């Protein structure tokens, strides 16, 4: 018969700090990739503007059999070069890089778990929002681009591309969120009350 449950007087061992440190390494790497993405988007936007500035739709399409469709095609490319996607995407990537710095430091130090996780969740939220925004803006142009191509039955392709693009972003962000949930669970504060076991049961 169980008469009592033994409660250990010794301090309970805390969770491993390497869960938070692992999150710090992962977000740190993604932060560096965000910096590279910010630079590439900024330079890409400048290059596209320069390229389209040298293109004259009327001159390019002068000898085309269907001048109107040719000019519509060139115009759709011009719209792509002038999209806010380049500037806003670069700004989002730069923000993710800057936000990753304090997030990585807090996670690596593993001293203030709650604050570190708040920064980490904030980083994941900004990352998710930016990815869905960039994907949405690109697919909006993508649909217009295929409308300018004089080939029928392309509607299925744009729908299929949208499904894959949004689905891919959703899976990526859910994976990040799941990883952060796991880190939150593994680093939760321990309790001093130990579960009863055969070693902690006193029988009289």
Residue ranges of predicted features:
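Topology signature of small-to-medium multi-pass alpha-helical membrane proteins
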Residues: 2-204
């Amino acid at each position: 018969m169980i008469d009592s449950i033994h409660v250990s007087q010794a301090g309970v061992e805390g969770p491993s700090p390497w869960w938070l440190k692992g999150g710090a390494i992962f977000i740190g790497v993604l932060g560096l990739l965000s910096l590279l993405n910010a630079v590439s988007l900024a330079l890409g936007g400048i290059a596209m503007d320069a390229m389209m500035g040298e293109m004259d739709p009327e001159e390019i399409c002068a000898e085309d059999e269907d001048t109107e469709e040719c000019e519509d095609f060139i115009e759709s490319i011009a719209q792509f070069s002038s999209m806010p996607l380049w500037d806003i995407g670069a700004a989002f990537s730069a923000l993710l890089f800057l936000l990753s710095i304090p997030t990585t430091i807090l996670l690596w130090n593993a001293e203030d778990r709650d604050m570190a996780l708040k920064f980490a969740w904030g980083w994941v939220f900004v990352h998710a929002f930016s990815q869905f925004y960039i994907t949405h803006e690109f697919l909006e142009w993508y649909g217009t681009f295929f409308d300018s191509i004089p080939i029928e039955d392309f509607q299925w392709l744009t729908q299929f591309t949208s499904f894959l693009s949004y689905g891919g972003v959703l899976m990526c962000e859910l994976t990040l969120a799941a990883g952060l949930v796991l880190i939150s669970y593994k680093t939760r504060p321990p309790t001093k009350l130990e579960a009863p076991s055969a070693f902690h049961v006193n029988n009289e």
